[in-house]
Amino acid sequence: MAVRWWIIPMLLLVPGSSGAWEVLSLPFSLYNFYECGFKVDIEALDCDLARNVFGQHLAQELLFKSVKEFIESDNPSKPLVLSLHGWSGTGKTFVSSLLVKHLFKEGSQSRFVHFFSPVLHFPRVQNLEQYKVDLKGWIQGNLTACGRSLFVFEEMDKMHPGLIDAIVPFLGTSWVVYGSNYRKAIFLFISNAGGDDINEVALDFWRQRKDREDIRLHHLESAISKAVFSNPKHGFWQSQIINQHLIDVIVPFLPLRPSHVRQCVRTEMVQQGLEPEEVLVNNITDSFVYFPEDEKVFSSTGCKTVASRINYFV
């Protein structure tokens, strides 16, 4: 294949003197424009999800199916838009990192993977209108550079309502927006909101002695939608993304049982080069706080603090 180079404008988001983020135009050289570092290993993604994500049968199934179908399409009808919901520590951020790892050659270091944090990038509500301009410019500039980009919006429950609507033009079915085809992009929204409702459903299944793996999306989707999209403090409050049905799949993450925490502990110990001795693994697992207080069914923090607890016990 011949080597091809393009010089195109790239937009850089930098902090301005007012506290808002400003968009700067920089020259940007692209090698093999149509590839954009997009190197898919779908089998490795499937394997990684199965081996390293615990207690999330539904999330694994929904994510893998939707991503596989999307990347196998030569002409997708719209960008893939996924919204991940569940309590902290249940695996949302970890799963998004696996997607990045197996979709892009350089993983999270790829210039075509973009992460947004409301607390870091959009902290001041008084700058909301400027943030909208900056965010739209950033998305437009980077999608013009590469239609195979991935955008991850973390902590949507902390985003100022109204801000996310700035990206609505890039999420629909249009062939071309602002001169470029954006339908091969992927957008991930991550939120803790809806976690309480997911937990209630999981707890009801446990109390009724129903198999956890029998929990399906239809058991959760309505409750998540109501909790998230009707919350005036959430980033999706009265959003056109919701009104126009631009989210393709809601992905619930279930609360984790002690057995799942134990798996997390073992895996982390092996990654640290430690011997996962049974007594030590059990002691670390037992140190977590579980709820409800009288039944101790689920971990209050999922697997979030596993690494720090191992360091404490070791």
UniProtKB/Swiss-Prot annotation:
Respond yes or no to whether keyword Nucleus is given for this record: no
Keywords tagged on the record: ATP-binding, Endoplasmic reticulum, Glycoprotein, Nucleotide-binding, Signal
The entry marks the following residues as binding ATP, namely 86-93
Tell me the compartments it is located in.
Endoplasmic reticulum lumen
- Pfam families xrefs: TOR1A_C, Torsin
| Main localization category | endoplasmic reticulum
Q: Which GO terms describe its cellular component?
A: endoplasmic reticulum lumen; nuclear envelope
Residues with glycosylation annotation = 142, 283
GO MF term set: ATP binding; ATP hydrolysis activity
- Matches recorded under Gene3D superfamilies: P-loop containing nucleotide triphosphate hydrolases
What is a biological process (GO) this protein takes part in? chaperone cofactor-dependent protein refolding
Please verify whether the record's keywords include Endoplasmic reticulum: yes
Fetch the PANTHER family from UniProt: TORSIN, TORSIN-2A
Q: Identify its protein family.
A: Belongs to the ClpA/ClpB family. Torsin subfamily.
Its quaternary organisation is: Homohexamer.
Please report the name of this protein according to its UniProt entry.
Answer: Torsin-2A
What is the source species? Xenopus laevis
- In the UniProt record, the gene name given for this protein reads tor2a
